[in-house]
Every structure is written in structure tokens, then in C-alpha cells.
Amino acid sequence: MSDGSCIVVNYDDATMPADGIVTIAKTVNIDGTDYTVSGILGSENWTAEDSYYDNGKTSYDRAAFANCKTIKGLRFADGSGVTWIGDHAFRFCSNLKTIENIPSELNDIQSWCFEGTALESVDLSNTNVTIMKDGVFYNNTSLTSIQLPNKLENFWDNAFYGCTALNNIVMPSTVVGIYNNVFEGCTSLSNVTFNDSYTTLGHHVFKKCPLAAVTFPNTLNSIGEYAFESTNLNTVDLSNTQITSLPNGSFYNCEQLSDVKLPKALTYIGDHAFYKSPITSITFPPTLQKIDAWAFQNAHFKNVVIPTQCSLIEQGAFSDNANLTTVFVNGLECYLAYKAFWSCPKLTDIYITSNKEPVAGRYGFPFDNNPKVHVMMDFVGIFSELKTSENYNPCNTTHFDSDFSLTLGKEWTTFTSAYNLDFSGYEDLTAYTAKYNEANDAVALTPVKKVAAHTGLILKGVKGETYTLPILDSNEDGLDAVTDNQLVDCVDAVWSSNSNEDYFLSGGKFVKSINAGWALPGKSFLYISSGRVNQSESPLRVYVDNTATAINGITNNPVVKDEAYYNLQGVKVQRPQHGVFIHNGKKVVLK
């Protein structure tokens, strides 16, 4: 070439070294002139003037060493200036086991270059390669390890497809994209160390890899279809990613997967996304709009809460959930398609919220075992008019009512609902609103009876007791006026930060949020917009403001059992001297 370089274009079996090790020289002398070897020919590097070297070869076989069965090793001379290796250059060199002394100048290994070789270990760490191109190590079934280029940015399609012996991958910090089928069929790949900056995972990228764990960084914005099909993942945390859509089959048939945290901004879950993945619980973000067909078939949920913005649950989305007992449909207009909750033998209660009269048939035959359907009182008649036709019962149930069943797991718990509810029918169950009092750095509770939907509450009742509360009309009069309530309602899940503003009820006191995460639907938490006065890390005490003075409120509150002293107005006293005080929930006299 005019620049003083040359390329390797072919080989001669007759001159192949006895040991099968081919050395790519730094320079070659042609007609008395030294030329620097800069590349190894690929099938697509041919031009019209290259016909001299064609020798009747066609297609991929024109690549330099394609289909060479006698080459066993490749070695680059010291100081080699090879910067590129062409496509298919060593394709089907089925006895090629080693590559040694790879030059640091190498910046381009083209597509399908080492397809079907017998390479066992490759070190590209010191090269300048930025892309693992299409099929570059496709079906290298003997490849057990590879040290990737330190400057690598992208994996193109099928780069390591079918490398069945590959067991470990460490991603350089520069990688941003891992595209389609890159590690599909790598049936020994159990460990991948990811960086914290990649953005894209393509279709089928880890399909049928025995991966047990994956770290998903906050830079990740897309996952392709069937990306993790049939992997061994047991937990998936996507909560901090930028993903808005989980496509079809994303985590299809992940038989060990029990715990999933979805992205905060997720709007769509594709069909078969978690098919046959035995997830035990899941929290849907409030942004979710659609769950497609068979998305959670064969999951192990006990209850499901469909968020308010979700308008469509497609066919079979939650079918064959053997443990599912309760479903809350918070969507104002949520269509439940055919067999949406089919073959859920323990499903007994469906709560449907709507601010509009339901269209007959909207909830047509999504269930199959006669569950109870609970709706607002003014909608009971409309739902009950959905008659059985000759072929099916549109709701597949004969029971519609306006009752809300509530079982307390603890004596004190937080609660919220998408319904207007009446708590006045029980002596041993009380609902409270809450307000933070800066003066004494405590939380005051105020009892309420008839409560509007979307009101954060604290409940006190009998642990393990089940209460049946009337669901009131959507326009019910006489609801208790609630002012200054600082409990955030979580009809849908609410993302809570680990700040000094969010507090959760624990052991009868409010404790500061430790880690960011979802506040679960059906619960509530205390939000102090300006934070606590003293920025204390200690739990916030609670007193019941149900009498004229704070004395009886504190006295009657078994939750307050700390070692502090309070005066008769409920204010904490740092060094009590003489007089009457409240201590550990009781009146004491100091003399």
C-alpha cells in the first residue's frame, strides 16, 4: 500500500508450521521493501482490484484464514502494528485454541471474526477496541474466560452467543450498551460483574444463562424482549432505573425469582414479562397504565393492588396464581380482560373502585371461582344487574356488596383506602389522623369515624381480629372533617426518600425513614415537610388527643413508654424537680 503498510490476505497449508502456530510478523519484505503489517483480511474487505488474491474463493471463504483446520494458535510479533482484523477472518478455524501477544494498537475486531473457533482464553484488556461486533466470538464453545478491552463501550448482537463454557464476565466501566443475544445460550455464565453506567440491554441478551444476580444501575433506560429468560435470578431491583416499559418476556420463566422491585416511572408491563416466575409479592408504581397478557401467570402473589392510573389488565395477566386471595382494583376505569384472574382457587375478594357507573360487561368473566366483589354502595345495584347469559356470567360471581374486610396484623397499624369507610360500628377499633407537634416534638392522634377515601390513618384494634366496615356512597354526606392530617395516604404506592421528613409507625412510635423505597399501598406514613425541630434520630412519641387535656391522652396511650417526663400539658421536661408529671404513661409525683 502507498502508506507503507500491507495486510494478510491468505494462507498456504504447505507452509503451515508443524505446530500449527501462525505468527503475524511486524513487517514483511516484498521486492526489497519492508512493509508494516496493519491488518488481516476479512470477506468484506475485498475490492475489485483484489481479484488477484481471490483464487476462485467466494463469500466468507475469501477471509484470510476462514475454514483453516490446520491453524492451532495465533501469535503477534513484538511491536506488531496490526490495528484491525477483518470479518470472518478466522471463521470456523475449529482447532484455533490460543491467541498470544495481542497488540495494543488493535482497535477493530470485525463481525464474526472468531466464529466457531476452539479458543479457550482471550486477553483484550490492553487493546483499543471499543466495540465487540456482531458474532465476534459466536459459538466458541471452548471459551472459558475473556478479559475485555478496558475502553469497551458496546457489545453488538450475538457477540458471545452460544459460548457454553464461558463462566465469568467483568464489564469495564466504559460499557454503555449490551445489545441483542450477546450472551444468549452461555449456559455456564453464572457471574457477571457490571459497571454502574450502562444504559441498554438488548433482546435475549442473557437468555438461558444461569445468572443468579444482576446489578441494575440508575443509568439503565431499556431492557429488550426476553432479556433474562430462563436465568437463575432470585431478586431483581429495578427501582432506581430509568426504565418506563418492560417488554414481552423480560423475565420469562425465571424459576428462582421471588422478589422484584419495579422502576419508579414504569408505565407498561409486556405480555409474558414474568411468566412462570414465582414472585411472592410486588408493588406496582402509581405510573403504571397497562399490564399485558399472561404477564404474571403462575406467580405466587397473596394480594394484588392495581394502581389508579392503570386502565387495562389483559387476558390471563394474573392467571394460575395459586396463592392469590385478594385483589384491589384502584383504577377509576380499569378494564379487566378475559381470564385476567383465571384459575386462582383461593381468590375470594375483589375490590373495585370507580368514580363512574360501570359499563355492563366491562368486568366480563375475568374470574372463574365465584369471588365476592366489593364496590361502592351506590354501585351495588348496577353491578348486580350484570346477568348470567346462556354462555357465561359476565362477572362470574353471584355476590356483590359494599363491605370492606380488614384484618389487623398488629394492634397499631397504618391504613388508607380508596373508599369512603365507616369505623363507627366497633368499640375496639379506632381510626386516627395524626399531626406533628413542634412544641413537644411528638405526634398527636385525633379519632375519626366516617372517613373519606384517600385519608391516611392510624388504626388501633385487636391483633388478628377481622373487621367488616361499610363502604359508603361515593358522594356520602356527613364524613368527618379532616384538617391538619400529616399522614400521607398510600392508596397507590408512594416513593419515600431516606430524609428527615418521612416517618413510619413501628412499635407504636414513628421512626425516621432509613432507606429509600416504596411505602406500600393500603398503608400511610407521617410526612413532616420542614423536618423535626431538633433533627433528632430518636423515635417520635405518640399521644392520643381525644380528651380536653393532654394528661389523659398520654395516660391512656400504652404506646408512650419511654423514660422521659412530661408536664400536665404534655410538654417534655428535661430536669423535673417537684410536682406532678407523666412518666412511662402514668402520673407521678416528685417531692
Locate predicted features.
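Extracellular/surface-exposed low-complexity segments
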Residues: 364-402
